[in-house]
Structure formats: structure tokens, C-alpha cells
């Protein structure tokens, strides 16, 4: 992907930033823990790490593998909550984007938005 930059700000409402992201040559993911719930920062960190690991070990990246990566992360979060009851209710959003050939593929869960910046114009996908 060309010209990818990651930046996260805490904003004006929350005391803690629960955003996490990773950027590789052809894959990007952003997660945002559910603020106001216990473990939002843990969920977002866990999710982005699991998505990254899953996709980096997947031989073929396509729409199905992006969805599978999010489902895999969700399963890992659910399993962790089962082991640590204090984390009950934790959750996160996720947006995953991959460049495959000349196409951008994406998958998301939750209310995080995806935008494309092209020709000096920002458009929500």
C-alpha cells in the first residue's frame, strides 16, 4: 500500500486511549476497545495481535480470510473472558484492509469507520 500512516489520539471524552493498529506491506488493521467497559484496551490489543498473527500465517489473503481473522480474534477474546471473569463484557471494534493485486479488500465489525483518501478527497466506505 502507498503512504500509510498510523496515528491515534485520546480525544476529549475518554481518560484512556483504547485504539490499536498494525501496518504491514499489504495489510492494515485498526481496533478500538469499547470505552466504558472493563478490558476495552485488553480486547483491542488482543484483537489486533490475533488478526496480525492470523493473516501473516495465512497463505492466501482474500475477503474470506479477512473475516476469518476477525472471527479468530473474537474466539480468542471469548476464550480469555471465560478464563478471566473480571474481563466479562470487554469488546472491541475492528477494521482490516488488505491490498491484493490492484484491489483493496476490507472487513469490519463494530462502529469504526473506514475512509479512502484519493484525489484530495476523503470518502467514507
Predicted features, each with a name:
Residues 1-125:
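PP2C/PPM-type serine/threonine phosphatase catalytic domain
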Amino acid at each position: 500500500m502507498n503512504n500509510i500512516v498510523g496515528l491515534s489520539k485520546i480525544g476529549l471524552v475518554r481518560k484512556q486511549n483504547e485504539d490499536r493498529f498494525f501496518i504491514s506491506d499489504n495489510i492494515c488493521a485498526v481496533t478500538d476497545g469499547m470505552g466504558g467497559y472493563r478490558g476495552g484496551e485488553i480486547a483491542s490489543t488482543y484483537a489486533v495481535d490475533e488478526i496480525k498473527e492470523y493473516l501473516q500465517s495465512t497463505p492466501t489473503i482474500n475477503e474470506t480470510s479477512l473475516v476469518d481473522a476477525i472471527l479468530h480474534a473474537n474466539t480468542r477474546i471469548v476464550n480469555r473472558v471465560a478464563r478471566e471473569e473480571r474481563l466479562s463484557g470487554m469488546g472491541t471494534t475492528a477494521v482490516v484492509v488488505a491490498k491484493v493485486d490492484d484491489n483493496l479488500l476490507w472487513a469490519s465489525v463494530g462502529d469504526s469507520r473506514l475512509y479512502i483518501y484519493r484525489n484530495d478527497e476523503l470518502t467514507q466506505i
